[in-house]
Amino acid sequence: FGGWKKSSIGPGLKPGGPNHLSGYGNWTEQNINIDAAIADYKDQWNSYFTQEHDPTGLKSEANILRYFPIDKVFVRCSDPTAPEIDLMRTASALTGVPLEISVRSDESEAALGNRMQRSSGDVRLRVLAPTTDELLSLAHASGITVDTAPVTGSGRLELTHWIKEQAISRTMHRYGRLLNQP
């Protein structure tokens, strides 16, 4: 699929693309090395997510992938000082996506739901703390993607939660004959 619209559902990884399968499971890590994770986030952002690329390498068709930051991420957590929150702040700074932190002990689910309802665009709720169906229903009613994946130290995995992926396809042949490309 090329383009945007409704062909990109949920977290925004295009079907058939190199990042698509990572959304079908959860990656977890024990004892994330924060310094190494931050370095990897920066490396992956600069070398992968800010570059247009064609992983197929076909001569007859270009399938260019490019990435755009989403509009906002809410995170529901129990401990705002947890290392995972520091990594989310790093991802937010790199991608330019605003991060709004909601601490369970400080904000009710209804209050967070009200804040989410006032948001617009491509917004995600990252759930890192136990929650109820009430909050999930509020997010769903607002058209917000709920993301329950744990934060990882892998920039390639983590930064996909902060972007939407666009595929641009271009035919480079005519009746089976390759066209001269500039």
Language-model segment annotations:
Residues 1-182:
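C-terminal segments
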